[in-house]
C-alpha cells in the first residue's frame, strides 16, 4: 500500500514528475536558442519568455547561470551522441551516416562554442564538461568510422580523437568571421578520407 504524506495525501504523482521533466526540457531548448542569438549572458527573463515559463521555474531547475549553461551543453552533447546509431541504421551507407553525423557535430560546435568558453573560468566544471564531451562523442565517432572502414567506404587508420579535434579546430573563429565557412574545408577533409571507387 502506498505511503501517505503527513496530511493524508499521496506522494507526488508520476504526472507531476513528467511535467517537471517537460519543463526542464523546454527550458533547455529555449536557452540553447537564446544563447545562439543573444549569447550566454542573455537575461534569464528572455529565456523564460521563450520557454513560456516563469523565471522561478528556471531557477528551481538551474540555481545559477553556470548550472544552466552546463545543462544546455550536456543536453546538446546527448542529442549529438544519440543521433549516431540512428543515422547508422537509416543511412544509405556507413559513410553517409558519418557525413550526416559530422554535419550535426559541426552544428553543435558552431552554435555552442561560446557555451564552453563561458565556463572556462570555472576550471573544475569546464574540465568535467570536456571529459563528458569526449566520453559521449568519441565512442559514437568510433562506431561510425569502424562501420565505414568495414564497408570499404573510407581508408583505415583515422583516429576518432584526431578527426573530432581537427573538425573542432576548423570551426574555431567562425563566430567572428562571417566570410569563413568551415563546412567547405570539412567537406574536403571527408573527401580525403573516402576510399576511391574502382571502375
Stretch-by-stretch model annotation:
Residues 71, 82-111, 126:
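Hydrophobic alpha-helical connector segments
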Residues 23, 76, 80, 94, ...:
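Hydrophobic/aromatic residues within well-ordered alpha-helical segments
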Residues 118-126:
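Short linear capping/connector segments at secondary-structure termini
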Residues 78, 111, 125-153, 158-180, ...:
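Amphipathic alpha-helical packing segments from all-alpha helical-bundle domains
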Residues 39-40, 60, 155:
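Helix-turn-helix/winged-helix DNA-binding modules
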Residues 1-41, 45-50, 67-70:
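Basic, helix-initiating cap at the start of DNA-binding domains
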Residues 52-62:
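Short hydrophobic/aromatic patch on the recognition helix
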